[in-house]
UniProtKB/Swiss-Prot annotation:
Its EC number is 2.6.1.-. The gene is TAR4. Probable aminotransferase. The chain crosses the membrane at residues 6-26. This is Tryptophan aminotransferase-related protein 4. SUPFAM superfamilies: PLP-dependent transferases. InterPro entries: Alliinase_C (IPR006948), Alliinase_N_sf (IPR037029), EGF_alliinase (IPR006947), Ethylene_sulfur-biosynth (IPR050478), PyrdxlP-dep_Trfase (IPR015424), PyrdxlP-dep_Trfase_major (IPR015421), PyrdxlP-dep_Trfase_small (IPR015422).
Length: 463
């Protein structure tokens, strides 16, 4: 009898030990199964240095044939490892690729990484029947709250494939707000303006919309009759000159669309939280991820929101679920410390570039840069300079009528002022590309300014 009791007790104890061991092992140790290959592949490709002048990517050429992805070199660098710099290579200062933030994200490799399963959200819609990730909507509202650049209360949040799609959706929605008017709505903006506004209006060639151009000229003309439906696009900070803008037009016939793609601490003092009826923002100028093609809008009026939403559904059936997951992870990193790391890095980087640029142009009598008075920034809690994405350069000599061609002859490709509705005496130079691009731009600018008649060569020694 005692022997049976002992055996029973031993059996119970062993079962308890095994149960505790299994529970403890399961809760404290986890071994990945299906993620091993993908993680190893990503880590391997990320380890390719490409001499610091390029990047390798998991979707690079040759991977389908079992080859290692090649280094994709920065502009003016060549070779298998991007180690060879081409002499007198033309500089690309045209594109607004925000690669200046790439070093920040490389430092955040672990926090920003995601691994997507092959069956991730295969449905068209989320559980609530929409095309919108509610978690992403929440983190976007939090982002604006911590930065203090926009009011999100009592606003609908709409997603699009970049602000390019949202711009088309917004203009479409606003042009349909008064169907009783037979003539098309006029699309207006301030000069210099972002060319996409004109390009989209003319490309879609809608019976409901006509690009008219300069808002100030319209206001002073006899056509400003308070009857013709008008849509004014206000870009603030402005592209190309970086200045804060306000609406020029008002009246019962005027609808205003605000493009705040550049209203982030990288580029501008955050002077106040904007509180508009319709505002657009872009991931590309927030985190630098232009290739993700993601933007969002804050819309006060439900009817306008519904028209925009219908436009998005009919043209793309929402934004990719993988994109929304990626953006969610990126913005979680941003808001995790109130944006301090990324905005301090971004502002510091662009500020240094402007300091270098100003030193060069201060020696020139042939070229001048835009000037913007410093303002108090509520985000950084100090008065600070504007640090725009672009240099808006003016050729001052009477004979220099085409500034773009003058810079192109100096092997600097900018963007012609006439693209922005302005004079050809202006050219836009991008300051937000990679450090390699900026270094090459500075080298070419030194040569250009150096050849001015009245600039002593010793002035360049400390730039």
């Amino acid at each position: 009898m005692m022997q049976k009791k002992l055996l029973l007790i031993v059996s119970i104890i062993l079962n308890l030990v095994f149960t505790i061991h299994i529970l403890y092992y399961s809760s404290t140790t986890w071994n990945p199964t299906w993620t091993n290959r993908a993680a190893a592949e990503a880590e391997t490709v990320a380890s390719f240095s490409c001499s610091g002048h390029g990047r390798a990517f998991v979707d690079g050429l040759g991977v389908l044939d079992g080859q290692k992805p090649p280094c994709e070199c920065n502009n003016c660098y060549i070779g298998k490892d991007c180690s060879v710099l081409l002499k007198d290579c033309p500089v690309d200062a045209n594109s607004g690729d925000p690669l200046f933030l790439e070093p920040f994200w490389m430092r955040q490799a672990e926090r920003s990484a995601i691994l997507v399963s092959g069956w991730h959200r295969m449905s068209y819609i989320y559980e609530d029947g929409t095309y919108v990730s509610r978690e992403l909507e929440k983190v976007i509202r939090k982002l604006h709250s911590v930065v203090g650049n926009a009011v999100t209360d009592n606003r609908f949040v709409i997603f699009g494939s970049g602000t390019t799609q949202l711009l088309a959706a917004a203009v479409h929605a606003l042009s349909l707000t008064n169907s009783s008017v037979s003539s098309p709505a006029r699309l207006l903006t301030s000069i210099p303006y972002y060319a996409m506004y004109k390009d989209q209006a003319e490309f879609f060639d809608s019976a409901h919309l006509k690009f008219e151009g300069n808002a100030s000229a319209w206001k002073q003309s006899g056509r400003n009759d308070n009857i013709t439906q008008v849509i004014e696009v206000v870009t603030s900070p402005n592209n190309p000159d970086g200045k804060l803008k306000r609406a020029v037009l008002d009246g019962p016939n005027v609808k205003t669309l605000h493009d705040y793609a550049y209203y982030w601490p990288h580029f501008s003092p955050i002077t106040h939280p904007v509180d508009e009826d319709l505002s657009l923002f872009s991931l590309s100028k927030t985190t630098g991820h232009a290739g993700s093609r993601f933007g969002w809008g804050l819309v006060k009026d439900k009817a306008i929101y519904e028209k925009m939403d219908r436009f998005i559904r009919l043209t793309s059936m929402g934004v990719s679920k993988e994109t929304q997951l990626h953006v969610l992870q990126l913005l979680k990193v941003v808001v995790g410390d109130g944006g301090n790391e990324i905005f301090s890095f971004g502002y510091g980087t662009v500020k240094k570039r402007w300091e270098t640029l100003n030193k060069i142009f201060s020696m020139s009598t042939r070229f001048s840069l835009q000037t913007i008075k410093p303002e108090y920034c509520n985000y950084f809690k100090k008065v600070r300079e504007f640090t725009p994405s672009y240099a808006w350069v003016k050729c001052e000599r009477p004979e220099d009528t085409n500034c773009y061609e003058i810079f192109r002859a100096a092997k600097i490709t900018g963007r012609n002022g006439n693209v922005f509705g302005s004079e050809e005496r202006f050219v836009r130079l991008s300051l937000i590309r990679s450090q390699d691009d900026f270094d090459q731009l500075i080298a070419m600018l030194k040569k250009l300014v150096y050849h001015e008649e009245d600039v002593p060569s010793e002035n360049f020694m400390y730039i």
